[in-house]
């Protein structure tokens, strides 16, 4: 009887089931999956803030696993990718949530390279194992979102919450129900990761939705008028000329559809242009365009384009204006990797040695105390900022290395944000296209979510004490025979 070679996906799924089951029930035997030449790295940072280095060999991996103190380790697998690699090996990528010793769940990414064991067909061992927590990898990029003047970010969210958020949630839920897992990117996890890059796309959706809401409002006001249709087309033909003034900034974010002309930016400029056409009508019809002029003027004042100090015509309170235009970016310094027990007075005294500190604030990340804090320091001059940047690395209390960076200009943040958003949208389009691999993994590792239980366990068995390892302490798993 000819033995069929199992597919990489079948090998990957069975390995994932065995590996995380052993991690939960008997982590002290986890090293049996590895061999003499295996490498193992587990997410974490040392005292200096650098990522932990890999360990090699089954014995060192055993000590490393014991030092991690795995106890009642529960894992929720969200996605598994498995592909064939060199020398008949299989590379497996796992994404999900991990909770150890009753701690809150944390998103993780783990990659295995499974090498074939020469003595037995369809038998593999872990040659490389790389594990990282997502919040440790992307933690340093989060403060850039807060750099955009926290006050104006909160104001933008308050203005935009009523319209765009339900649309995004409906879109995500529809995509989630259709195919929970795709080949490489899982959309629900992507949206919940709090990454700042997709913001331009939601901004565009927001700007597209607001004129529609305003037009409905105007239609209700114009029902009492004799001819409501001419009032709306009057503004539409005039919008393209204004769009050219923003083309160099927003062309990357505007979709190539008919909704470009109805973006939320130009309408407040179009209303005065359309007035001469409306003035030819009775005076009753001239009122709705004036309402149209007033309403959009409050919202487009907040997008982070153009110089902030020159916008004195925005009807904001004085305290908000003072916070936005008080100090230039060259006087401000971003400080990351702050200890949790630090207070503002201690940090201010530390930076007073470089120059006069006029303002300081510390932000706490809400991840259950797992991540270091970050903050912003404002000097009365740009020279202390440059001295600190030249003097890097900056050591606090003699043992904590602070991550200090100059506050980036608004143009640089927009370029980075928009560039990342375009690439991410392209990836999502490719993943959501027809004929995609949604059916390959959807019925396998996602069974826990649907309540149908894990895959059948009769396919592969764990064999201990043979192969390339160190005698009885080395474990292997084999593919099923068909």
From Swiss-Prot:
InterPro entries referenced in this protein's UniProt entry, alphabetically: G3BP2_RRM, NTF2-like_dom_sf, NTF2_dom, Nuclear_transport_factor_2_euk, Nucleotide-bd_a/b_plait_sf, Ras_GTPase_bind_prot, RBD_domain_sf, RRM_dom
Domain NTF2 stretches: 11-133
UniProt region (Acidic disordered region), positions on chain: 142-220
Composition bias type Basic and acidic residues, residue spans: 191-225, 290-300, 408-432
Segments for region (Disordered): 140-170, 187-318, 408-482
Modified residues (Phosphoserine): 141, 149, 225, 466
Annotated positions of the N6-succinyllysine modification: 392
Transmembrane segments: none
A UniProt-annotated Pfam family: NTF2
Coiled coil location: none
Cytoplasm found in the keyword field: yes
Record-annotated RRM domain positions: 331-409
Coarse class of the protein's main subcellular location: cytoplasm
Modified residues (Omega-N-methylarginine): 457, 468
Annotated Acidic residues bias: 140-158
Gene3D superfamilies documented for this protein: 3.10.450.50, 3.30.70.330
Regulation of catalytic or functional activity: Under physiological conditions, G3BP2 adopts a compact state that is stabilized by intramolecular interactions between the RG-rich and the acidic regions that inhibit phase separation. Upon stress, polysomes disassemble and mRNAs are released in an unfolded protein-free state.
A biological-process GO annotation: stress granule assembly
Keyword rRNA-binding: no
Any single GO CC term annotated in Swiss-Prot or TrEMBL for this entry: cytoplasmic stress granule
Entries under PANTHER family matching the protein: RAS GTPASE-ACTIVATING PROTEIN-BINDING PROTEIN, RAS GTPASE-ACTIVATING PROTEIN-BINDING PROTEIN 2
Domain notes for this protein: Can mediate both protein-protein and protein-RNA interactions via the NTF2 domain and RNA-binding domain RRM; protein-protein and protein-RNA interactions are essential for undergoing liquid-liquid phase separation (LLPS).
Function: Scaffold protein that plays an essential role in cytoplasmic stress granule formation which acts as a platform for antiviral signaling. Plays an essential role in stress granule formation. Stress granules are membraneless compartments that store mRNAs and proteins, such as stalled translation pre-initiation complexes, in response to stress.
Name used for this protein in its record: Ras GTPase-activating protein-binding protein 2
Organism: Mus musculus
